[in-house]
């Protein structure tokens, strides 16, 4: 109770699995884990899970991996992440700029802060890009930027949760003039 004013607990619900090479890509892509790739079933199951969790009063957080699937689940997401492998991706930065929830951008897989800081700067600004509508048509999207983008320290070659690493991160964020 003493931390209620400072912390909001959310449930991490990740439906997509980032892969360095190959392997199962997650519930949305292959819900039966049998290479049938029934993405329609996966999306419907993902939405059901999100509805069930939010109906319990628990906000949900997820990593946005595929730039198309957020169109079908973002209305049920309270917080999102852009992963270390996609932090430098232009399409993910554009996506982050248009989402209606706070977006954390992870530092690079090596631990480098620059990909995340550059991602935050990009997400804070408006973008124009092609994507799909909910009915599957290609459309041009214009975003207004996401001022609630922030860094996620996920480690790298070494841990980065210590006070010295956090201070270096804060200094780098101030120098880059981002949240």
Model-derived regions, located:
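Short acidic catalytic loops
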Residues: 1, 178-179
């Amino acid at each position: 109770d003493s931390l209620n004013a400072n912390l909001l607990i959310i449930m991490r619900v990740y439906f997509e699995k980032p892969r360095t090479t190959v392997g199962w890509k997650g519930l949305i892509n292959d819900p039966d884990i049998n290479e049938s790739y029934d993405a329609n079933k996966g999306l419907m199951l993902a939405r059901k899970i999100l509805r069930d969790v939010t109906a319990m009063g628990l906000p949900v957080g997820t990593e946005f991996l595929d730039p198309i699937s957020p169109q079908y689940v973002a209305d049920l997401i309270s917080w999102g992440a852009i992963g270390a492998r996609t932090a430098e991706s232009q399409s993910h930065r554009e996506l982050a700029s248009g989402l209606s929830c706070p977006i954390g951008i992870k530092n690079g897989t090596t631990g480098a802060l620059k990909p995340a800081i550059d991602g935050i700067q990009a997400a804070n600004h408006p973008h124009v890009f092609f994507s799909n509508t909910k009915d599957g048509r290609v459309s041009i999207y214009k975003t207004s930027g996401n001022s609630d983008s922030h860094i996620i320290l996920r480690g790298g070659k070494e841990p980065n949760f210590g006070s010295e690493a956090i201070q270096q991160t804060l200094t780098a964020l101030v120098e880059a003039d981002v949240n």
